[in-house]
């Protein structure tokens, strides 16, 4: 072979090798072919654009060196200023890095977003991507994956973030959740409620309540119909928001109704739903419809303990005895100047401050009718958990408050008055009591632009920056091609790869801003967890899914580290599933802090819960912790709230499949926290939770449909919850009464029939004989009867007759009044 030809072939091989190291980058077009990628280094040019030019899709810089993969309106005033109007994001709360991140339509047909280290941050939901040929950005703003016949296999319209676009269906499975500037999900949800009514919901761990339609009016007065279970809505091209729950064909109509206007329906971080219309001449946006015309009616606007009032503009203030937690972010609300706890509570050192024409909506411990002001006061002051009470003059209605959320003032004609409980040592001035006064001459404006701001460090670059830009990898390829012989090229290639395969711990530790953004959920190296657990020295427990060890992280957080066993998923799928679980946050669910996926190691890092499992306390012989009635009822309620959140509220609904006392942990205040949720997916024993067939749960807690091989739904958790209720009441493990699965089911059927017969009568003396002999008296027999009745309904053979966990929560709350 002639030398020039050999040199040319050698150069071509070298270039091919280097180019093969990186995914194919797609240029600006509406189609992403199978096997192609959009790469973050070329984010300004490597985009998809709808055929009519209205929408673009690609990497959007949310912070320095931090990107989301998003869809945006192409021609707007904001886009020209590089502040694009985002209508959908794959990873709104988990940005990827500015180097080596890519969105790839893989050869198997799935679309995956990977971070700089190759970790899958997001992937398209679905199980069947057979025959996929391309991804396409449609003129509607819908990003779709299509097969060879042009059929849609997946679409972004099915998983909206904070915006609905015209022609996009609003269904029972879709919801809007705003993203704050700190890239965390907001506290508001727009979705169909369980009454099939399109609703705005304020949702935080302590409370979840609807504020639109107006909860103080009945639905019919608001033009809504709760008797249509269709749950279907849509924003039309003309600016009409129609929904199946709107009575008599009503609809919400834009002020500029008509065709030819570009629109978007967005749930903003302040909790208001707004319809925006674009001005074609300059690309600016204007509000053409708003759900909440009075901002103070938005629940939680001023955060916990805060009060919204008009002076005359909407303003947030703290009540007497409270101070602003973060002046730049009112969603954090107010904190008590003097914090009182139940272990040091002395009602003689407490007093009440009257806040006229004021209310904290919801969070009532109970509702009492026709009682005196003194009686209402005595009820609250005798309860260390009561923060204050609302009292209505004339009707004698009394509402003791467990929490102080959604505070607001009303016109002077309103009869609602809050009596705030404060230590006697806290001084109070009448000038500090918030009031709505349209004649106030010095209004303190509610700065909506600062409502959700959180100062964050910019993301630092993981590489040392020099003259290289987004084409740095091609630069190395050409240098190697022209200056390095074949033998030295091989050595350089190995160095090139290994240099960048840094250990995860080294990469994370070197990036303070990046680590800060992902500190709520991050990846740990195996070496970090070996150190944290002191080589897995202290075992906390073990089960079918793995062994749990106690550990302490470098930031002194105490954690539980679980070594998962029998994980057969690939690394990318495991990390993608965990990215969903890591976003789940509820006060009755154990918080997942992170994971390790290194080689064959699969570990979960979660918060350490001090008092261990309910099983240890409930069933251990000679235990030194005895649960009183109040504690047991609170555990039943807390577990119900946690399961209701998994089934109905979190962004991706989760079936636990193994609810039992071992998976219910108790913190220092004996508040229950459910653990091991989401492990059905992680352990890959049956695939999707919509079609689980191999996970069998634990003997004594498994629902009949497991045995019948029926499709598994959330009702399996309801059944297991019913068994847990029986064990809470009796203090005895059901499975120990008999042996074998069939015998347990047979015994439970007899027990359910016996309890059902007892519940038909008015007699209550039999309840004492059924309850745990170790139970400290007194017992609230109304609550006991409610728990027994709920357990019986949860243990129905026919799963369609079992209640939902949301219904269970409401049942228990009504008994708690």
From Swiss-Prot:
GO molecular function, one term: protein kinase activity
Enzyme class: transferase
Subcellular localization(s) per the UniProt record: Membrane
Limits of the Bulb-type lectin domain: 29-158
Record keyword Transmembrane helix present: yes
Domain PAN positions: 342-424
Ranges where the EGF-like domain occurs: 292-328
Catalytic site: 658 (proton acceptor)
Lipid bilayer topology: Single-pass type I membrane protein
Transmembrane feature ranges: 473-498
Name this protein carries in UniProt: Putative receptor protein kinase ZmPK1
Organism of this sequence: Zea mays
